[in-house]
Amino acid sequence: MHRLALTAQDNLAVAPMLADLAGRYPDIEDPELIRSAPVLAAKGLPPHLLAFLDDFRLREPSALCVISGLDVDQDRLGPTPEHWRDSQIGSRSLNLEIFFLLCGAALGDVFGWATQQDGRIMHDVLPIKGHEHYELGSNSLQHLSWHTEDSFHPCRGDYVALMCLKNPYEAETMVCDAGDLDWPNLDVDALFEPVFTQMPDNSHLPQNTAESTGDPTKDRLRARSFELIKSWNENPVRRAVLYGDRQNPYMALDPYHMKMDDWSERSLEAFQALCEEIEAKMQDVVLHPGDIAFIDNFRAVHGRRSFRARYDGSDRWLKRLNITRNLRGSRAWRPAPDDRVIY
């Protein structure tokens, strides 16, 4: 794990900037704030924090990077929302969200999905009543199966980032680093073949977002996206599970959303052996309030252990960002060069 602990001096140094930005922008989704984030990060974040993030980005010392020690005032934060739709109405965590955004901007460009949480850039991960046994980040009584974030999509992010605001029962985030796997004893060549069917995960389905954005143009684009999601579910795209350097490969897999019934015997055996190796090397990481985790989405899979939600305002509450190092790579999927939402 690549880890940095913020000091009291670090918190004091960034507090005036965060307060100023929180007073200047209405919410974390403000396009000008998001557009300015890389410049604001370069000017306002402590140099040693920027160097730490740059080291994680370029050297790949680990698939998991954790920044701890960000001050979180629980009284100011207020109760955990009942639903992600309620989370940004008069947000009392805007200063923390801005810090999280700036750290993410030091690694790449943040982006969102039209088919996920109403196209928001910053997501909320919290238990939702009725989702307890649903394969979704808002479940609680069952594990969230380990996966590569958005493994089905060619524009998936380089990093998925999580900022912990609350975690009273210390629910564990599961992470497996590709660097820990015993590649010489796996059938790497078979896993590099583009024969593995991967389907969209449940978070991109239309029932998990609002019926309308209020913008007819965006609604048309989003309807097209949902049709594409439907087509990928009915006719899954075949992709390789591994790519990059065959000696130390990158991964893209989500076993829960992969249809295996027509794979060759070799492909199935290679995939099952990889999954068994991942299970054996999986680590549990408990995020505490003020912890920010950056998971390398090329080099790790992640999930979450089950827990019993309370629905009393004290439940586990994380913020989430998707980050890419190649925003141009998704240009065909976005309405404009500076639009951060993939349709």
Curated annotation (Swiss-Prot):
It catalyses: L-ornithine + 2-oxoglutarate + O2 = (3S)-3-hydroxy-L-ornithine + succinate + CO2; L-arginine + 2-oxoglutarate + O2 = (2S,3S)-hydroxyarginine + succinate + CO2. Keywords: Dioxygenase, Iron, Metal-binding, Oxidoreductase. Fe cation binds at residues 147, 149, 302. One of its GO terms (molecular function) is 2-oxoglutarate, L-arginine oxygenase (succinate-forming) activity. Residues 199-218 are annotated as: Disordered. Residues 199-215 have a biased composition (Polar residues). Its cofactor is Fe(2+). Binds 1 Fe(2+) ion per subunit. The keyword Chloroplast does not apply. It comes from the Bacteria. It holds the Pfam family TauD. Being totally regio- and stereoselective, this enzyme is of interest for biocatalytic purposes to produce chiral scaffolds that are of synthetic value in the preparation of more complex functionalized chiral molecules such as natural products and analogs. 2-oxoglutarate binds at residue 316. Its EC number is 1.14.11.-, 1.14.11.41. InterPro entries: Alpha-KG_dependent_hydroxylase (IPR053447), Arginine_beta-hydroxylase (IPR023966), Clavaminate_syn-like (IPR014503), TauD-like_sf (IPR042098), TauD/TfdA-like (IPR003819). Alpha-ketoglutarate-dependent dioxygenase that in vitro catalyzes the regio- and stereoselective hydroxylation of L-ornithine and L-arginine, leading to (3S)-3-hydroxy-L-ornithine and (3S)-3-hydroxy-L-arginine, respectively. Cannot use L-lysine, D-ornithine, or D-arginine as substrate. Belongs to the clavaminate synthase family. This is L-ornithine/L-arginine 3-hydroxylase.
